[in-house]
Amino acid sequence: MGDPDLNPAEYDFIAARGRVEAKKKSAGEKLTSLEDAVARVKDGDHVSAGGCLFSRTPMALVREVLRHRRRALTLSRNLTCTEGELLMAAGAVTRVVTAWMSIGLPWGVSKILRHYVESGAVGLEEWSHLALGLRFRAGAMGVPFLPALTMLGSDLVGVGGMKTVQDPYTGETLAAVPALFPDVALLHVHRADRFGNCQIDGYPHMDADIARAATTVLVTAEEIVSEEETRRYPDRTVIPGFVVDALVLAPFGSFPHECYGLYEADYEHFAEYTAAIDARGPAAVGEYLERYVYGPPAWNDYLDLFGGERLALQAKRARELTR
């Protein structure tokens, strides 16, 4: 359950609007390196990750945050997956704001989350999936809250300081779902031009709202295309360049998670990872961090650990599923 007095600045819509309005809306180039992009993440920041569960997770950015040894972060994501487990096990995250945390139904609720929450090392603030989406939407709109029926009648009423309001038209009680204004957004997209105009294939999840609600927006892209390409299909540009602060080219930037149409999630890798946790508990995540995060110095070195054949197999699976 959430602490109603926890980080009230997250709900300060006037200050948050001021921060977003103060951002430079120039058409300058946003391309940079992973190291330079993640240097913008500070200890104590509230970091929101795009995608959903193991879909379009910004793994290259998460890995770089871990390599920067950031501390006392809050992580918010609609459905949290292995990226959350790695951040907790590394001591980077001390608070998680989510609707669910797992790799998927076959593996059940995260045992790593349970360990760190029950030990008191990590605070958990649980919202419904809809409520968390509304929080990002309210943040993107620059309003203090959005009314809804979600969570009413459940034990989640009051989580994170959520209050109820009376509908002025009918007198009915509504949930006043508070806006969420992250310090940093971590996002992964299919393609972007050098000015940060980002396109996403398939379901966009909550990324567009997160990008507009956050003070600082860091994006990795599978491909950098010309601005003529983004102008040719403007309807596909779900994140405008003026909200993006840093853009990094990162092929397979979600791996071992999926990126719709380009590569599938590596379920065999997930099975190996969870089997290790079943056998050795949180220590297995520490071993994983040493091998996949702290060991390989660059993103391409990380991908080399999986091998070209394994990456090609997941790309083939994605093509077969989206024919």
Language-model segments: residues:
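Conserved alpha/beta enzyme-core scaffold
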Residues: 1-323
